[in-house]
Amino acid sequence: MTENHNKTLSPELKEKLSKIKHLALDMDGTIYLGSTLFPFTTKFLADMKEAGISYSFLTNNPSKSVADYLKKLEALGIDANEDNMYTTSLAAIDYIKSHYPEAKRLFLLGTPSMITQFEKAGYISCADDPDDVPDVLVVAFDMSLEYSRLCRASWWASQGIPYVATNPDRVCPTDQRTVLVDCGSMTKCIEHATGRQPDVCVGKPDPNMLRGVFERYGYKPEEVAMVGDRIYTDTATAPNAGAFG
């Protein structure tokens, strides 16, 4: 931080910043946009390492498995490993394990990459079949969305199956000339069709996203700062979890 910037900070803010040991970094729209790395990202991450501040990647985007996210980061020139990643797929898995420990079969409205993450955790992905009844319905950001599967998800929602959404984002940031309809818009579609909202939405601003970081790395809430681009998800997560942001 420059001397001029330091002079503009209040004593209270300086004290809070002095406690920060770890950054929880959003990904889409924060360190990259679509397939484009922001020009400041590499230097920013290097500066944090030099300052002794660790970081992890905390994303509401469940469309990629952790393995596929690591491949993307590597292609962008960012060094990361599995321990650096916490996605809403992982948050949904943790939630289901905690709240529905007997659940084995899930209807997953999500990408093939996301589905592999759930299968890796030991779950069975139900088919688009009225006789293949799931224990839990999971609705996510599905870039491979098929109309029949959206209808099937709506059917299970109408039947009272436990219903978990991965994130409330209405659209996903992109560097392309299009609108990427995200999970929050898909759950609204299901709500209009069935009258039912998700039982829980595990992504930011849900505080459990940051609590997973506290537990994984052993930090206190006041030692973690949330960095992101969206007020209604990223910025709101920090106070919900007692962190800085």
Q: What is the predicted role of each segment?
A:
Residues 1-27, 31-245:
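HAD-like aspartate-dependent phosphatase fold
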